[in-house]
Amino acid sequence: MKALIIDDEPLARNELTYLLNEIGGFEEINEAENVKETLEALLINQYDIIFLDVNLMDENGIELGAKIQKMKEPPAIIFATAHDQYAVQAFELNATDYILKPFGQKRIEQAVNKVRATKAKDDNSANAIANDMSANFDQSLPVEIDDKIHMLKQQNIIGIGTHNGITTIHTTNHKYETTEPLNRYEKRLNPAYFIRIHRSYIINTKHIKEVQQWFNYTYMVILTNGVKMQVGRSFMKDFKASIGLL
């Protein structure tokens, strides 16, 4: 699991980081001390669990929690604070738990186990839905090049881009170039994994390595093979929804 700790007190962040490392099972534990850092972190990573203080320097934690809950796939929120008077508001936001400072490892572990149990159920449901969608699509994509037809496994396709009449298909181990238009491939790709982010680009969301803020309030997507593809302004809403930012 990936965790994000949001607190404007360094000591509180350090303590929570230490306790989570003691509990174990976390792939990544990151920290943010304000709203700006939080939004940047949520843009780059998809977190499973967030520890959120109520009192932040630039915004009330309850208000920030409400914004996070509007994401397409919001992380579990655990309020970790010294103030008990916001508990009702927190649970109205469907918070997973509400923990008071000073933190105890057993209490933190109880909250983490709640998230793990819920995540296991959600993952099973999501896998079932993805399998149903995949059943309606071929697992391979036929690509004709020089009188040969290459059968590319869709799971190995990282992204597809077109420029000056040449369509380039990036896979995990090769790059294919063809004169076939991008639209031809878009119709054959599994929408459970692929999304068009620009009139010239289609990406596999499973191969997103990093997302950077770009010019004109757009994003630059860096894929797992290092290729960069820009998100077009008219595609921003769908892209943000696909990575859980709406």
Swiss-Prot record:
Residues 141-245 form the HTH LytTR-type domain. Residues 2-116 form the Response regulatory domain. This is Transcriptional regulatory protein LytR. It comes from Staphylococcus aureus (strain MRSA252). Phosphorylated and dephosphorylated by LytS. GO terms for molecular function: DNA binding; phosphorelay response regulator activity. Pfam families: LytTR (PF04397), Response_reg (PF00072). The modification 4-aspartylphosphate is found at D53. The gene is lytR. It is found in: Cytoplasm.
